C-alpha cells in the first residue's frame, strides 16, 4: 500500500501510465461552455430541469424558473434509460419528436441544453441541439460511445456508475481525453452499498469523492444529489453539503408539480423550493469566493 494514496485504489504508477491525461499532475482544467459559463474556476454552474422531458408546458415552466434565477444550463432528457422496461400509464418517451420541444425552448429562452445520449446513432440529431452531452451512469464504461461522443468536441458530463471506483471513473474519462477533447466534466451521483439505509435512500451520496477527485484529477467535478438520495426533502441539505466539499457544479431535478411527474416523482423539488435553494447557494458561494451561474 506504500504506493497508494490514502484509502483509495489509485497509485503513483496509475497517474503516470493509466490516467496520465486526467491526472492531478496536470494543470487544473476549466471547461468553458459559453462566455459566461464554465466549470472548474470561480463559477459554480447549476444544471437544473428534467431528466425526462414530458411535454412543452412543463419544460417551459422549468425554463421560466431558470430565467428567474439567472441560470443557463437546462437539463432536458429526451431519451430515458429506465431501470425496468415497463412504463407507467402516465409516461411515454417522446423520442426524436422531443427535439421539436427543445427547438422551441432555445428560441424562447436563453438556455443551453444538457441531455443524455444512450447510443451512437443519436449523435447526428443531438449535435443540432445539445450544448453538453451527458454520459449516464449506466454507460460510464461504454467506451465506444464515449469515444464517439468525444469526437464531436462538445463538452461531456461523465457520470460515475453507482458501483464504480474513482479509478474506474478516471479510466473512462481517459478514453474521452485521448480523443483530444479536454471538455470533460466528472459527476458524482451516488453509490450503492449493501449497508446503506435502503428503506429511506436509493444511493449513498459519496461526498468524499469530490475532494478525492480534486486530489487525483485535473478535471472539474459536478454533484447530482437528486439522483443519489431520491427523496426531494433531502435534496436541499445535500446540495448545500456538495457545495461545501468543493463541487464545481450542481445538478438539480425540478418540476412545477413534482408529485405528479411521470418519471421520478419523489426526487424532484418544486419551483419555489428550487428558488429558495438557489438563493441559499448564492449566499454560501460568496463565502467561498465563488459565483453561482
Regions found by a protein language model. Give the residues of each.
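Glycine-rich, proline-tolerant flexible connector loops at the mouths of alpha/beta enzymes
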Residues: 75-97, 255-266
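Catalytic alpha/beta core domains of metabolic enzymes, predominantly
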Residues: 39, 152-257
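Active-site mouth loops of central-metabolism enzymes
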Residues: 44-61, 84-92, 112-116, 136-137, ...
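Acidic (Asp/Glu)-rich catalytic clusters
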Residues: 39, 63-70, 103-108, 127-128, ...
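N-terminal amphipathic alpha-helix/helix-capping segment at the start of soluble metabolic enzymes
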Residues: 5-47, 288-293
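Alpha-helix-loop-beta-strand connector modules within alpha/beta enzyme cores
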Residues: 89-115, 148-155, 207-221, 267-290
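N-terminal small/glycine-rich loop or linker at the start of catalytic domains
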Residues: 28-51, 82-86, 214-223
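Catalytic beta/alpha-barrel core
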Residues: 75, 92-94, 110-122, 131-146, ...
